Every structure is written in structure tokens, then in C-alpha cells.
From Swiss-Prot:
One GO CC term, this protein: plasma membrane
InterPro entries to which the protein is assigned, alphabetical: UPF0060
Keywords: Cell inner membrane, Cell membrane, Membrane, Transmembrane, Transmembrane helix
Family membership noted in the UniProt record: Belongs to the UPF0060 family.
Protein's name in the database: UPF0060 membrane protein YnfA
One Pfam family in the UniProt entry: UPF0060
Keyword Transmembrane helix among UniProt keywords: yes
Amino acid sequence: MLKTTLLFFVTALCEIIGCFLPWLWIKRGASVWWLLPAVASLALFVWLLTLHPAASGRVYAAYGGVYVCTALLWLRVVDGVRLTVYDWCGALIALCGMLIIVVGWGRT
């Protein structure tokens, strides 16, 4: 379970970085060269999703819970925005959904 969650976390970071770098280029006028590591990060994201031993749809559904929490962590650390009680509640609900799916995929 911990290995799966850690893999989901690293996968989410790759996806977020792969989307954040083009955002910097478009919104903040960063160098177009930031698109190269963005592409590499998104390619790594896709590859990491293939490392899970469950059906792809189930992996994507479970991954979503960790993605939500990782995005909120990004919001706090990178964007400097304080999380609200709604953010925390949403993260808890998303993680509960992920947990139910991951525990269940070992039993089917």
C-alpha cells in the first residue's frame, strides 16, 4: 500500500510539473525551453502509470485521489496559498476513495 501511494505521489508530481512548466511559459513569459523538461516530465508520468499491476481504469481512478492531495500540497508549497478546511476535507475524501479502490483491487 505504501509503495503504491508513493508511486502515485511521484507520478502526480511528474504530471503537475509537466503542466506547470508550459503554464509558466504561457502565463509568465518564461523561456520556451521550459517546454523540453515539461515533455520529459509528462513522458515519465505516462510511464509511471504503467508500473501498477491493475487494470488501467482502476489505476487512473485510484491515482486521482493522490493527485488531488499532491495538487493541494503544490498549492501550499509552490503557490503559497493557505489551505482551507474545504481543501482538507476534499483531500480526505479523495484519499478515502483511493484507499477503497486500492484495497479492493487486490481482492478481485
